[in-house]
């Protein structure tokens, strides 16, 4: 799809690989400029005292360039606590496709098995109706999250669609529904930009609670609150899938 990327989940390794080389180039460029500047000045120095003074200036400037590099690495390359906090709430460098979000939810509620997505379930012979190809589920990996934490997240998602949850009202007319969800309001732009107040509506959900069969991810561009927009899409999917 034009404009779509494969998405990524931030990690210490990703951050270092993404931003580390840029700051290394900046440092090397700055030091090279200092070396070139003082090579000329030293060549034109008239006496030893002037050369010593220039060497000291050069050393200080190189030290300053190194210090600036270390500062940048500390905050923009090395993983910080705020990166963990941002990632935990879906902010920061997170970037996911709707399919990845749906698979994310499926992984949580199936006990931690990340499955290989596929589009075609089976192929039938158009004449005989015989199954000539049947896709088989493939487990990509088991996530390193304890069963207790997975169950805790699943339970928390169920509270979103019940009681005073942010999506409880969405399912009031659907007593058959038992599952869970997470509403989302994805900020498009940063503060003090034209896009500051624009948001996409997101909604991820699963059903039923005890034996999950389906996970859904819906995104409505400029949809603001997920429960008001994308949630309606997920609700329609559940109704169609379960025949409610």
Predicted segments with their positions:
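Noncatalytic linker/hinge segments flanking ATPase motor cores
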Residues: 41-44, 219-224, 244
